[in-house]
């Protein structure tokens, strides 16, 4: 990395950002505009029917968000003219060839773009297989093919997980060979069968979700999301040619740690479901090993690493992987989150819909399925059966209590099933490449460290959870 400001690499540059209405993309757009106001253009790809709709979406879902308050204060009355000069919404969708962009502006984009930042993805763990395949696999391929035409753009494991690309066809369990084209054909054929059988939309959705989880686990991945993202990476590595390729692999992304708004976040993420469930009095137990490490990293650190990596890798023609994680340098156990949640709600008790204070209790974390299921039977299943009989005898007068208990049971079971691969995860993500990147920045760009910090060792986890993340979850997610 050359010895001058990292932000300088983006001066007079044009960047295309996909998935631009998403959490990470918003942080990226805000940070680039604030760190390098002399960036030439940011093209924001959004799903929209036309340019007018795209512009409206960007205004409502990106620029109009609280996240941009600091940038707005910096520019004052000139904020809107600054945005109009730098930010260009583009209607399109990565699932289509040429990203679904109108032919009339394609040539201009191919001529101007210096960087393509793809953060478009469907991140639901149990997404429909066809949807995840289209976005996370074929979408990534479409973005790569688009980038090649730009003039200036040249699972279930244990132990140490290396920062290396996936080999084409690689599986995590050695269970046969993964043929991506066969998977694409398989999901398309299954969908045709469902349509031929005149299956309802609900049946098709359930079948596709189950198919995704089944195929993921067959090849050793815990869910559809990480499986399809891995296949997307394989295609990128296989098809990139001499195109410079930087792949950022963040672990569980949490709220902003420092900059610009500590605690800011959008959409419920892995650990947030536990916090929200506890806040609403719905979580009475969980499944996992409290002594194991939960690998979490704040969203602003992920974006900072993206920016530094882009600058460092600008003139390289190879591929590199960066794990943006905390398990190697600053591990935090699930027990710390448990403790922080209990401490926070002991000091700041919540009020339920009935106006009563929700009691703060320590939530047990069961280390095996047998003890978890025993607890759920005694705590929920048996009482539900008794209440159901009483409800029949009392002419449905306590139906609301039955429904409430059933909802709590379903919530806890679904949470346990969905997140068990993470609450029992015994791996540790190697971060040698990320560490080298950080050390290079420490050596040559010390003045930018406060703005572009991505060192997980700087995080005090108890302070972060108690004073930043949990309050952020309650403010932005817990309605």
Predicted regions mapped to residue ranges:
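N-terminal Rossmann/SDR dinucleotide-binding element
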Residues: 1-122, 129, 155-201, 224
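NAD(P)-cofactor binding segment of oxidoreductase domains
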Residues: 115, 127-148, 154, 168
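Conserved catalytic-site region of short-chain dehydrogenase/reductase
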Residues: 125, 151-156, 253-255
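Conserved catalytic Lys-bearing alpha helix of Rossmann-like short-chain dehydrogenase/reductases
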Residues: 139-143, 228-236, 302
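Conserved beta-loop-beta element that borders a ligand/cofactor-binding pocket
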Residues: 193-263, 271, 315-322, 327
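Substrate-positioning beta->alpha
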Residues: 227-231, 270-271, 289-310
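C-terminal beta-strand-loop-alpha-helix "lid" module of Rossmann-like NAD(P)-dependent dehydrogenases
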Residues: 261-284, 405
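Mid/C-terminal beta-alpha module of Rossmann-like enzyme folds, strongest
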Residues: 311-418, 430-436, 440, 445-454, ...
């Amino acid at each position: 990395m050359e010895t001058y400001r990292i932000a300088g690499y983006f001066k007079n540059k044009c960047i295309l950002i996909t998935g631009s209405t998403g959490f990470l993309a918003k942080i990226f757009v805000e940070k680039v505009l604030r760190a390098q106001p002399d960036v030439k253009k940011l093209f924001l790809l959004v799903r929209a029917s036309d340019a007018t709709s795209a512009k409206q979406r960007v205004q409502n879902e990106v620029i109009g968000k609280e996240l941009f308050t600091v940038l707005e204060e910096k520019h004052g009355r000139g904020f809107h003219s600054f945005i109009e000069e730098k930010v260009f919404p583009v209607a399109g969708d990565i699932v289509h060839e040429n990203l679904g962009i109108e032919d009339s502006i394609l040539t201009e984009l191919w001529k101007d773009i210096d960087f393509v930042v793809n953060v478009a993805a469907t991140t639901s763990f149990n997404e429909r297989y066809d949807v995840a395949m289209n976005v996370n696999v074929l979408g990534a391929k479409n973005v790569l093919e688009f980038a090649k035409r730009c003039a200036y753009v040249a699972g279930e494991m244990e132990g140490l997980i290396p920062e290396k690309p996936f080999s084409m066809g690689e599986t995590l369990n050695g269970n046969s060979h993964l043929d991506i084209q066969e998977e694409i054909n398989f999901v398309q054929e299954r969908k045709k069968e469902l349509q031929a059988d005149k299956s309802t939309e609900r049946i098709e959705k359930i079948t596709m979700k189950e198919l995704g989880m089944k195929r993921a686990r067959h090849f050793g991945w815990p869910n559809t999301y990480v499986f399809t993202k891995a296949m997307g990476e394989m295609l990128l590595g296989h098809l990139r040619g001499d195109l410079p390729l930087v792949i950022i692999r963040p672990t569980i992304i949490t709220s902003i740690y420092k900059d610009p708004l500590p605690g800011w976040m959008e959409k419920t993420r892995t650990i947030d479901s536990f916090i929200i469930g506890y806040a609403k009095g719905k979580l009475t137990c969980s499944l996992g090993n409290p002594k194991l490490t939960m690998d979490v990293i704040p969203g602003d650190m992920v974006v900072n690493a993206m920016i530094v990596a882009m600058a460092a890798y600008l003139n390289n023609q190879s591929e590199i992987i960066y794990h943006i994680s905390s398990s190697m340098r600053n591990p935090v156990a699930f027990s710390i989150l448990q403790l922080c949640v209990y401490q926070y709600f002991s000091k700041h008790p919540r009020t339920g819909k009935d106006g009563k204070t929700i009691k703060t209790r320590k939530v047990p974390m069961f280390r095996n399925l047998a003890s978890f299921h025993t607890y759920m039977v005694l705590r929920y299943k048996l009482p539900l059966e008794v209440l159901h009989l009483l409800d029949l005898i009392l002419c449905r007068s306590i139906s609301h209590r039955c429904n409430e208990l059933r909802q709590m049971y379903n919530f806890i079971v679904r949470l346990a099933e969905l997140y068990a691969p993470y609450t029992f995860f015994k791996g540790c993500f190697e971060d040698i490449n990320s560490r080298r990147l950080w050390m290079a920045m420490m050596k040559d760009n010390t003045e930018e460290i406060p703005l572009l910090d991505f060192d997980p060792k700087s995080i005090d986890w108890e302070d972060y959870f108690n004073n930043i993340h949990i309050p952020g979850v309650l403010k932005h997610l817990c309605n």
